[in-house]
Amino acid sequence: MANTTGRIPLWLVGTVTGTLVIGLMGIFFYGAYSGLGSSL
């Protein structure tokens, strides 16, 4: 974990991005499946 000063570690970027993508997809599919997506 050397030479990471002033930069965001790639593993942190990947983890946050993956979590956000999965969360957004989960909310989208859950809303569409439960019928809430059609009312938005």
From Swiss-Prot:
Q: Tell me the membrane topology, using the record's own terms.
A: Single-pass membrane protein
Q: Does the keyword Plastid apply?
A: yes
Q: For this UniProt entry, which segments traverse the membrane?
A: 8-28
Q: Does the keyword Membrane apply?
A: yes
Q: Which domain of life is it from?
A: Eukaryota
In the record, the note on similarity to other proteins reads:
Belongs to the PsbJ family.
What is the official name of this protein in its record? Photosystem II reaction center protein J
Which species does this protein come from? Psilotum nudum (Whisk fern)
Q: Which gene encodes it?
A: psbJ
